[in-house]
Amino acid sequence: MCEIIGRKKEIAELKRCYESGRAEFVAVYGRRRVGKTFLIDEVFHDDMVFHHTGLSPYDRRRKVTLKDQLQNFYFSLLRHGMEDIAQPKSWMEAFFLLERFLETCDNGSRQVVFIDELPWMDTARSGFLTALEAFWNGWGNMRHQLLLVVCGSATSWMLDNLINNKGGLYGRLTGEIKLSPFTLKECEEFYQSRGIRMSRYNIMQAYMIMGGIPFYMNFFNPSYSLAQNIDALFFSRNAKLGDEFERLFNSVFDHAEDCMKIIRFLGTRHSGFTRKEIAERTGLNPNGDFTKMLKALMGSDFVVKYTPFGFSQREEHYKLIDSFCWFWLHFKEKKAVKQNDYWQQHLKESDVASWRGIAFEEVCLQHISQIKYALQIGAVSSQESSLIVKGSEEADGMQIDLRIERADDAVNVCEMKFYKAPYVVTKGYAQVLDSRLQALEEKNPAKTFLLTYVGNSDLVSNEYSDIFKASVTLDDLFV
């Protein structure tokens, strides 16, 4: 096994299942390109007796059919040593062939069976799930040496059909792993392992573009600067990620075009929109399929649902949180350019500065535990949210980037700033912050509000900087 960056908890769970001495059924899911296949291959490389990957539904020419999936499964069995017999005509037959094959190569040691991109195999009216249920309930769970690992990027399918299954597979999983993108610290370790020298300032910017997805980071050229790498990946002719946005959605979501329509609309406002606003502005019918699409986008960590502080439950907002999508929509798609040095030429433009502010906030929201650790409140129970206060005739509205409401009745009100140079608090800005504090204290007199600076650069000490009672800077986010 080669060196694996991070993933310590996930590796420990996989090893626990391997060493249990009983039949194990493990589901691994997470965003596409996050490294699920790599993890399983590396951990179980020497013990895998069968490995199969479903065919991607992303085919520009035609839909992938049940016949295609069955033929592909049959060929995988042959490649692993099954005797050459008739090709199965149904999933029931296919899984029966897998049973027979595993019995013939059973030598008493652990048998690891890895089925990758499981949701792709479940084509319309194929009977796939019923056959999988029969395979496990009727045979697999009685084989003490069997370790079945299934993977899927279509997170909503994995959640609905395996993890939260209400039918024959209810409660059958013995292990469940959701694989998340790398943290900033893990990204730093990844780049170092590839011989890529980057400052933490640039690692942060890379994260703001690609969101800690190792598949994208793997394309980096060590001899290029960050800006050169971004041009090579996104903007040059034959860019490696030139069609990644559509490929990503078409390979994961059933209603890919409508899901992309939702994502494009959510990308127009950082704070997000209500369900009603999304339906009205996209022209989509707010029916059951619409609900499933929103659920699928949330399950795959592209979108989050939240109720802004001060709003009613009926005003729940849906917000785009995927860094890659933010960058793609604002630059790759919006600009529609094929210029080899586009990013290098436009780094100092105002729209890039505006995007950086939003993108930095999203990275911080993905590193809440690091922020809490830096504030020495890691062990304190808390709830995190943004804060939007509606304006009225009597008072102005306000928006706060991050609010950490703690069990000890203190609230960290976080202001996030992305500046290359050390940040200087001006007299005018200090007055704005002070008025916000007073408004919050009037509404919540039992709480103690602590203004907290979260930035990639240091906070300059001056006569106004003590408005902030705590600060979190770039190095704190790399813990």
Where do the language-model regions lie?
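A cross-kingdom feature that marks ATP-driven nucleic-acid transaction machinery
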Residues: 309, 316-479
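Phosphate-binding site recognition
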Residues: 1-346, 350
